[in-house]
Amino acid sequence: MTEIIKALEAATSLSIKPFGTDTIEDCICYSSYVISDNGAVKQEKLELRLITKTIAEAERIKPIIISTLVTVGDNKKLNYLGCELNGGGTLKDAATGTIHTLLFFVITKKSEVKL
């Protein structure tokens, strides 16, 4: 996951934080977990929360994130077999006034499990 976080940081110039943040700033918060692993192939769900002060900034950064991660056909990116956008949405935090854009990715990798 470290390689993915570094790639997102380089592409967006935003700070990347695990789980969440307690400050009002433009950033990306993430969490990930394994959804399947059969010993040959592992799939992980990467949940990103892009936090911005304006919807215009969210709309500017969102395609950068997607193009950094999503693979087309057999064109590998980073150190995984494939990545697809699996869902998301946008909402406004009424307490802070920030825009939260959710992006859910499924990342397919070679399994690290030795059977």
Kindly label every feature range from the protein language model:
Residues A40-A56:
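Short glycine-rich, basic-tinged beta-strand/loop micro-motifs
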Residues M1-N38, A56, R60-P63, S67, ...:
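Small/polar-rich, solvent-exposed N-terminal microdomains that initiate assembly or binding
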Residues K53, V70, K110:
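Residue-level marker of positions within ordered structural domains that often coincide
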Residues M1-A10, F19-T21, Y33-Q43, C83-L115:
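Short, charged interaction patches at domain edges and termini
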